[in-house]
Amino acid sequence: MKKVFIRTFGCQMNEYDSDKMLAVLAEEHGGIEQVTQADEADIILFNTCSVREKAQEKVFSDLGRVRPLKEKNPGLIIGVAGCVASQEGENIIKRAPYVDVVFGPQTLHRLPKMIVDKETSGLSQVDISFPEIEKFDHLPPARVEGGAAFVSIMEGCSKYCSFCVVPYTRGEEFSRPLNDVLTEIANLAQQGVKEINLLGQNVNAYRGEMDDGEICDFATLLRIVHEIPGIERMRFTTSHPREFTDSIIECYRDLPKLVSHLHLPIQSGSDRVLSAMKRGYTALEYKSIIRKLRAIRPDLCLSSDFIVGFPGETEREFEQTLKLVKDIAFDLSFVFIYSPRPGTPAANLHDDTPHEEKVRRLEALNEVIEAETARINQTMIGTVQRCLVEGISKKDPDQLQARTANNRVVNFTGTPDMINQMIDLEITEAYTFSLRGKVVEA
């Protein structure tokens, strides 16, 4: 049985893709063993992220660490997948000639053949083409062990924000046919999955073809998934404010399975910066979406993405972002210092903000966001939360870990039969990034 080591960088889409790589290899070899140490593996895969320079360079650092393993065992297969593979292509082989296969997000289904071709020819294989939806037609049915699962409904992005490399590494937006998505979810539900997380670079741009040739939009998809037997909770990530329509907002009113947690990236509170980023909305338009959502779902927890130190961002513009964060009361969010990506329009902009100032802005924004997260956690003490038990706690092997609808981790004392089940927990303690609870007896 082939032993496979895989390291995943970046977003949930990459996590989904990594699972699919393991699945296609398992189908090819009649099963595989996933190992946690690279020196135990027959196949080593790095599923990469190119959103920030630091993540990209980390890949080449890791490749350097496994080079001695290749020298010791020439039959070892080393592969680079994901967005760095799409962006760098043949350059990866030039920089690290011991790499055997390089493939993009849209060609992961070709991995087994690429390995065979490498072993047959002795030549490194590179396939970073964009065959659109083809990959989904060649992936084996999903097999899961947990109570929650990702389902990719679309790939790519056509927004071309000035700072973002995704359209160049994952291609333009394309949606999976509706029936394909529903079949995958129904299959997962039959395996005991309780929670579905719909995935895409911009899920609210979903336009899936139906059997009759008509198009299903994202709001309609949510309503259909809501009725699939066995599915008790629904999430989605990531969405774009430009296409967060009233019909999607109304789903928060009508669909109780849709969780009270939303990740909706804004990036900046400055209209000038948003325009330079080519985001396609103003801060006021974003706030209008949130007002509508909270009017019909008052308990909604909102997380977001922010970039500080975008080229030309002034202190006043950063203060506008800080004010917006306080006004909206964002939950735990992701704040990044701007990282220029090759080939994007923003990479050509003049950047005169000192790094030390960017770090100060990062810390100031994180301080406000973490304070709000802690406040929300405190308000949950004494409440009873419906939670999905994910497994053994990462903090204490004698405890279990569950997740609330608003995306909080709860550690508690329970029994193994609770894993992958929905249970009620009373929250007893709150920390900055997690909660403690106890089982509510029926």
From Swiss-Prot:
UniProt-annotated location(s): Cytoplasm
Highest classification ranks of the organism: Bacteria, Pseudomonadati, Pseudomonadota, Betaproteobacteria, Neisseriales
Domain (TRAM) ranges: 378-441
SUPFAM superfamilies recorded: Radical SAM enzymes
Any one Gene Ontology molecular-function term assigned to this protein's record: N6-isopentenyladenosine methylthiotransferase activity
Swiss-Prot/TrEMBL cofactor(s): [4Fe-4S] cluster
Reaction(s) this enzyme catalyzes, per UniProt: N(6)-dimethylallyladenosine(37) in tRNA + (sulfur carrier)-SH + AH2 + 2 S-adenosyl-L-methionine = 2-methylsulfanyl-N(6)-dimethylallyladenosine(37) in tRNA + (sulfur carrier)-H + 5'-deoxyadenosine + L-methionine + A + S-adenosyl-L-homocysteine + 2 H(+)
Primary role: Catalyzes the methylthiolation of N6-(dimethylallyl)adenosine (i(6)A), leading to the formation of 2-methylthio-N6-(dimethylallyl)adenosine (ms(2)i(6)A) at position 37 in tRNAs that read codons beginning with uridine.
GN (gene name): miaB
Entries under InterPro entries matching the protein: Elp3/MiaA/NifB-like_rSAM, Methylthiotransferase, Methylthiotransferase_CS, Methylthiotransferase_N, Methylthiotransferase_N_sf, MiaB_methiolase, rSAM, rSAM_horseshoe
Domain (Radical SAM core) ranges: 143-375
Organism: Neisseria meningitidis serogroup C / serotype 2a (strain ATCC 700532 / DSM 15464 / FAM18)
Subunit text: Monomer.
Gene3D superfamilies in UniProt: Methylthiotransferase, N-terminal domain, tm_1862 like domain
Gene Ontology CC entries for this record: cytosol
Binding site for [4Fe-4S] cluster 1: C11, C49, C83
Main location: cytoplasm
The protein's Enzyme Commission number: 2.8.4.3
Residues annotated to bind [4Fe-4S] cluster 2: C157, C161, C164
HAMAP family linked to this entry: tRNA_metthiotr_MiaB
Protein name: tRNA-2-methylthio-N(6)-dimethylallyladenosine synthase
SMART domains: Elp3
Cofactor note: Binds 2 [4Fe-4S] clusters. One cluster is coordinated with 3 cysteines and an exchangeable S-adenosyl-L-methionine.
Residue ranges constituting the MTTase N-terminal domain according to the UniProt record: 2-120
Family recorded in the similarity comment: Belongs to the methylthiotransferase family. MiaB subfamily.
